[in-house]
Amino acid sequence: MDTINRRIRVRFAPSPTGPLHIGGVRTALYNYLFARQHGGDMILRIEDTDSNRFVPGAEAYIIEALEWLGIKFDEGVGYGGRFGPYRQSERRDIYRTYVRQLLDSGRAYIAFDTPEELEARRAEVPNFQYDATTRGQMRNSLTLPAEEVERLVAEGTQYVVRFLVEPNVDVEVNDLIRGRVVIDSSILDDKVLYKSADDLPTYHLANIVDDHLMEVSHVIRGEEWLPSAPLHVLLYRAFGWEDTMPRFAHLALLLKPEGNGKLSKRDGDRLGFPVFPLEWKDPQTGDISKGYRESGYLPEAVVNFLALLGWNPGNDQDVMSMDELIRLFDIEKCSKAGAKFDYEKGRWFNHQYIQRKDNAELAELFRPILRENGVVATDEKTAHVISLVKERVNFIGELWEQAGFFFIAPLSYDEKTVKKRWKEDTAKQLGELAELLDSHRSFAAEATEPTVKNWIETNGYHLGNIMNATRLALVGESKGPHIFDIMEVLGREETVGRIRRAIEILG
């Protein structure tokens, strides 16, 4: 199996059975990093062979989510390419050809056993599986006369095509993460490859045929597919494609924060974090699940966070851009063990990226929140405000919590703060401060601060009392950045107006 001189081609092949789970996002990301690092191609293939589980809107959701995260494709659904179509439901004729090839070569057979008959066998025989020891007792083209098989097919009797697994064959799987694994084919069952009921192949056949025809060089997927890898190797052999079989890499699971089991939506609901990249509305129940985007995460933070769940660059660096991840990523250094999902670390990453992001870009993201609150502000003012408060926030949505008072004057004052900060002589002193500020020429922080502090010292007032009471008047509580920075943003008229309004209300 020589892949040294092959062009690197990987695929992300989700099924449109619901929203893309964050574990699936990580799989897409690792494929993307690997492809870009090697100058290869990234393919988007939609594996929609299971019509019973198809969910309207899921395919569009998957594409939008990956675009938001900056995971780009070179070909596939929505991108085109010379190996299309890339939606499996549109490749029926192709699959039929290869089903027939397996039947003609004796590597597969037709089985007519009904679901009820199979269920009865399972009830009779503990751990029953359809394999070399049982296929001779079942209703299939190996046990029925050829003319009866032809008659049943011609009459429209529903059937499946099963792969004929030869027993006592060593099947070797070379995994880039887990190393060399050899299993005895005798433990494998004769998997269904095709169902006449819907004229579609199962995952196993479609997957192998598509990867071969699309010249996929590496299959990077979740470890839930590891038990199927020996079957896939046997299918490559059956078709005579072993020399061009892709290299496999099976990624360890994302685990619950406690480490006991696979991460699920229920864990997110229980602990208060998203498990989907974007908000998802279930078309059947109408239930809405929050996404990372709607929760205020930056896409680059999500990418960085996910990249380090199951892989690390071998140094102390945590914060890495997509370009840095592409340069450093090594599929063979991915962990064999599952990675605990540390949602607090995700918050930390988002905080780091908010600090690094340009204030003008953050202002663009903050604008919809301002609109929701009835605020119209200049880009310049919004960016200035963000520069003052962003070190206190982990998410875009928290900007309003920290900065809303810059845009809307407080309608009330925190009772505890009033009791603690509003003294008997506060109204008189703030009245004098309002007069001073109203006559001050420049309202830049570096101009007002020395003037106010000099006035406080000259009058023998207490600096802390004046500053705390002024903050209460301007903000409504004891929070916010440097008080003179607040004054500068608010401007003379608004600052003086808020101080005088507080005096009027609090007395």
From Swiss-Prot:
One of its GO terms (molecular function) is tRNA binding. Its main location: cytoplasm. ATP binds at residue 265. It is found in: Cytoplasm. Signal peptide: none annotated. Disulfide bonds: none annotated. Keywords: Aminoacyl-tRNA synthetase, ATP-binding, Cytoplasm, Ligase, Nucleotide-binding, Protein biosynthesis. Its EC number is 6.1.1.17. A motif ('KMSKS' region) lies at residues 262-266. It is an enzyme of class 6 (ligase). It comes from the Bacteria. InterPro entries: aa-tRNA-synth_I_cd-bd, aa-tRNA-synth_I_codon-bd_sub2, aa-tRNA-synth_I_CS, aa_tRNA-synth_I_cd-bd_sf, Glu-tRNA-ligase_bac/mito, Glu/Gln-tRNA-synth, Glu/Gln-tRNA-synth_Ib_cat-dom, Glu_tRNA_lig_a-bdl. It catalyses: tRNA(Glu) + L-glutamate + ATP = L-glutamyl-tRNA(Glu) + AMP + diphosphate. GO terms for cellular component: cytosol. One of its GO terms (biological process) is glutamyl-tRNA aminoacylation. A motif ('HIGH' region) lies at residues 14-24. NCBIfam families: gltX_bact. Catalyzes the attachment of glutamate to tRNA(Glu) in a two-step reaction: glutamate is first activated by ATP to form Glu-AMP and then transferred to the acceptor end of tRNA(Glu). Monomer. Belongs to the class-I aminoacyl-tRNA synthetase family. Glutamate--tRNA ligase type 1 subfamily. This is Glutamate--tRNA ligase. The gene is gltX.
